[in-house]
């Protein structure tokens, strides 16, 4: 690979939040004595704050917005009524300036070492070519385009092409089995399926042509299939068009192509809930809301600058993600601000028979990454594997580390800080002496973050620095009272532009309301307040404004930063003839090593042996993903259930985390309280005598 001259960003680099604050002073006459004062302004004057984001980022529109909030009430808030935007327009506005600076749009690599760079002009041309192909196939605004692709350049091109013509994008990762993908795509009835022939992961190739054929056969709405030869053509799919042919057009039509203007609330993409209480919920986000939320988050709070701007020249943004996680969407959002995105497709921990947690760091070194993000579990694994960053190449350009997906432990943060402090002695990058951790927490539900980073605030290991601008986040106690320095339910009391437009085929918003607003509906405390969005996380807001996330308050599996609903796992396990009932709990909590036990009730006369354990794990691996194989499988007599028959996942999770049984479960509300003794003993054995669950 040709060595490129490195330009390390050195002082006086101005934090992006400082640039925005100065702009507010210059254009709005606003001054703030502290970040807390700025945050309070942003959540009390929503119109002024979100209009400032529109203006600051120069959102292209043929029709500037007349008002910000036509309606303020959740979940029916109407943002920027009458305005027109297009997500892809915001990306492509950087083509000429970034190209003139000689900067690529995307740098990619897979675990086999294949390195590619895509220019901004090629990104637009190939997106235009595919967009025109989709239009020729009859794709109109509102039609769904479903993709079954890994984290590669072709996925980005497919997304921009779809968004450009008003199609609605939806993506599943190729490590998901047929059943899990159909649970999602059947609900949205896509017109086009864009898929790959296979993927490589952890040193092994996986042919996916059979899965693609099964998807096509089970999706009668699909009229057209496009197949990308990701493995070089390991197999064919009848009547599928080659992806390369759809992006090959280079003529007057592609040169003149421009994304079409769409209403602010036109659907951009459909992402999915974890499916804890049934089928995954198809969550619809709009062009405008995602534009505003993503720019504010990525630039102001993540401090990711424009690659061709003097203050952040050469910025390269990386956030490791599979296409089964909303962080793929957030990674792609880096292009909105003219930032070069660096993407990696493969296992960050190396091949199965030779684990190597330095893999992703070497990728970052060789591609010149400046912002390096991943799930918190990745950094914990690096620490446990004794990775020495000094042996991973030239990491001198990295000036920020991003984490999400699960809480980052103090121990892991201190490990990373010490590693970079040692690097700073030779890197010449002063930012590495006390590397900035941009820890954040949010959700697929609104494709953003509630709490996150601020380059100007102090860092306290184990804490997230602040509540984000525009996010009216509070911690509620059991009575719905806002509390500080106590653990409570994370709620948002004011609307955000990127909150779901609706769930697909949920015309009366019943599922939407029950998902977020059942706990704190309008006037929930008799004072006229509400409704408030309940997110499902435990949160403590510290007296200095910091935030600590204590994990999920519901039963969602959050496995190494990837979410999956328990119901999907049960479908796979309980389809086996030997299994009568099952329950799984995810104990990834406060940065501890992920531990997920699976409890199974077997048919009479059957005992759990190694062969049956392997069969159960194989069913999960095949139907869902290898990432959701449990740490252990345990035979039990009964699964705890409520009187109405619901599995009591959350109480058992709390029990296994060390809380007393009498505080986590009401035996009178149980159908089978006598079964709890076994789980208490299991918790006692796991926690040890020092933390007895009685």
Regions found by a protein language model. Name each.
Residues 133-176, 180-182, 300, 318-322, 399-401, 408-546, 553-556, ...:
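Conserved AMP-binding/adenylate-forming
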Residues 224, 583-588, 597-599, 617-694:
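Conserved C-terminal "lid"/linker of ANL adenylate-forming enzymes
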């Amino acid at each position: 690979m040709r060595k490129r001259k490195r330009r390390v960003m050195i002082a006086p680099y101005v934090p992006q939040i400082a640039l925005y604050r100065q702009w507010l002073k210059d254009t709005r006459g606003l001054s703030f004595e502290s970040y807390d004062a700025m945050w309070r302004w942003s959540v009390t004057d929503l119109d002024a704050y979100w209009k400032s984001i529109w203006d600051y980022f120069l959102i292209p529109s043929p029709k500037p917005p007349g008002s910000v909030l036509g309606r303020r009430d959740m979940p029916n808030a109407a943002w920027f009524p009458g305005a027109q935007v297009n997500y892809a327009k915001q990306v492509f506005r950087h083509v000429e300036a970034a190209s003139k600076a000689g900067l690529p749009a995307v740098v990619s690599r897979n675990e086999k070492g294949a390195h590619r760079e895509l220019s901004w002009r090629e990104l637009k041309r190939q997106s235009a070519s595919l967009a025109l192909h989709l239009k020729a196939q009859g794709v109109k605004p509102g039609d769904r385009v479903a993709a079954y692709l890994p984290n590669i350049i072709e996925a980005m091109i497919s997304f921009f092409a779809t968004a450009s013509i008003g199609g609605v994008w939806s993506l599943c990762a190729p490590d998901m089995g047929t059943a899990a993908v159909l649970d999602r795509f059947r609900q949205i009835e896509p017109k086009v399926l864009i898929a790959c022939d296979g993927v490589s992961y952890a040193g092994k190739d996986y042919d996916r042509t059979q899965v693609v054929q099964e998807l096509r056969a089970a999706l009668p709405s699909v009229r057209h299939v496009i197949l990308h030869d990701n493995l070089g053509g390991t197999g064919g799919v009848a009547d599928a068009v080659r992806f390369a042919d759809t992006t090959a057009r280079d003529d007057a039509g592609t040169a003149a192509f421009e994304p079409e203007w769409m209403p602010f609330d036109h659907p951009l993409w459909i992402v999915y809930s974890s499916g804890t209480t049934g089928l995954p919920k198809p969550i619809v986000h709009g062009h405008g809301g995602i534009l505003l939320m993503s720019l504010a988050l990525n630039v102001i709070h993540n401090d990711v600058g424009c690659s061709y701007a003097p203050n952040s020249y050469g910025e390269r943004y990386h956030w490791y993600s599979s296409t089964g996680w909303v962080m793929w969407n957030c990674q792609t959002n880096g292009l909105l601000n003219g930032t070069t995105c660096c993407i990696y497709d493969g296992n960050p921990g190396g091949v199965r028979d030779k684990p190597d947690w330095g893999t992703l760091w070497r990728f970052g070194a060789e591609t010149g990454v400046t912002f390096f993000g991943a799930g918190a579990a990745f950094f914990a694994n690096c620490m446990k594997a004794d990775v020495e960053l000094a042996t991973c190449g030239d990491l001198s350009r990295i000036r920020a580390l991003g984490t999400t997906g699960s809480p980052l432990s103090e121990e892991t943060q201190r490990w990373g800080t010490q590693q970079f402090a040692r690097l700073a002695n030779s890197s010449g990058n002063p930012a590495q002496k006390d590397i900035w951790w941009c820890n954040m927490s949010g959700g697929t539900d609104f494709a953003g973050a509630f709490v996150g980073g601020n380059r100007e605030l102090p860092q306290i290991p184990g804490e997230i620095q602040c509540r984000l601008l525009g996010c009216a986040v509070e911690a509620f106690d059991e009575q719905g009272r806002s509390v500080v320095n106590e653990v409570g339910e994370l709620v948002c009391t004011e609307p955000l532009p990127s909150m779901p437009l609706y769930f697909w085929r949920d015309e009366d918003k019943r599922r939407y309301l029950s998902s977020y607003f059942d706990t704190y509906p309008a006037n929930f405390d008799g004072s006229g307040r509400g409704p408030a969005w309940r997110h499902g996380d435990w949160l403590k807001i510290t007296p200095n404004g910091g935030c600590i996330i204590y994990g999920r308050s519901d039963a969602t599996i959050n496995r190494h930063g990837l979410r999956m609903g328990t119901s999907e796992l049960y479908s796979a396990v309980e389809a086996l003839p030997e299994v009568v009932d099952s329950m799984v709990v995810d104990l990834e909590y406060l940065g501890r090593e992920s531990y997920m036990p699976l409890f199974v009730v077997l048919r009479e006369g059957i005992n759990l042996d190694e062969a049956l354990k392997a069969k159960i794990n194989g069913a999960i691996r095949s139907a869902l993903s290898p990432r959701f194989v449990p740490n252990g499988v345990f035979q039990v007599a009964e699964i705890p259930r409520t009187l109405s028959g619901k599995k009591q996942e959350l109480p058992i999770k709390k029990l296994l985390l060390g809380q007393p049984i009498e505080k986590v479960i009401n035996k009178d509300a149980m159908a089978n309280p006598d079964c709890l003794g076994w789980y208490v003993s299991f918790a006692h054995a796991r926690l040890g005598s020092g933390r007895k669950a009685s």
